[in-house]
Amino acid sequence: MGRVRTKTTKRASRVVIEKYYPRLTLDFQTNKRIVDEVAIIASKRLRNKIAGYTTHLMKRIQRGPVRGISFKLQEEERERKDQYVPEVSELEVDRVNVDQDTKDMLKSLGYDQIPVRVLAPAPQERFRRRQ
């Protein structure tokens, strides 16, 4: 099993990533040199632990956003996703296909002028038991 990382290691790695993200890579040796340059770390062992966890987090960041870490590129990507507007609005179509419950909800909210086509709900498949 792996070792448990201390709060100091995790916090230091997060700070290093937030401040120096463009310089960091997925390579431990490179990250070790960068951590050594940008931070004053008392021991070689602690420096290596911070560099190792930084490399681990960088690999996780490649797959998607990581909780607790925000840097400029990630913020810009999040803003871009939040500001996304589709080319054609779903409500601009001639008719919107909805079920009866959705039509009733639209009517109660005052959107009864939207042309809708009520479809019968699709029958749900029941699970088959193994024999």
Curated annotation (Swiss-Prot):
Q: Which domain of life is it from?
A: Eukaryota
Gene3D superfamilies in the cross-refs: Ribosomal protein S17e-like
Q: Which UniProt keywords apply?
A: Cytoplasm, Ribonucleoprotein, Ribosomal protein
Drop me one GO molecular function for this one.
structural constituent of ribosome
Q: Name one Pfam family in it.
A: Ribosomal_S17e
Q: Where in the cell is it found?
A: Cytoplasm
Asked whether the UniProt record includes Isomerase among its keywords, one would answer no
What function does the entry list? Component of the ribosome, a large ribonucleoprotein complex responsible for the synthesis of proteins in the cell. The small ribosomal subunit (SSU) binds messenger RNAs (mRNAs) and translates the encoded message by selecting cognate aminoacyl-transfer RNA (tRNA) molecules. The large subunit (LSU) contains the ribosomal catalytic site termed the peptidyl transferase center (PTC), which catalyzes the formation of peptide bonds, thereby polymerizing the amino acids delivered by tRNAs into a polypeptide chain.
Protein name, as recorded: Small ribosomal subunit protein eS17A
Q: Which organism is it from?
A: Schizosaccharomyces pombe (strain 972 / ATCC 24843)
Q: What is the lineage of its organism?
A: Eukaryota, Fungi, Dikarya, Ascomycota, Taphrinomycotina
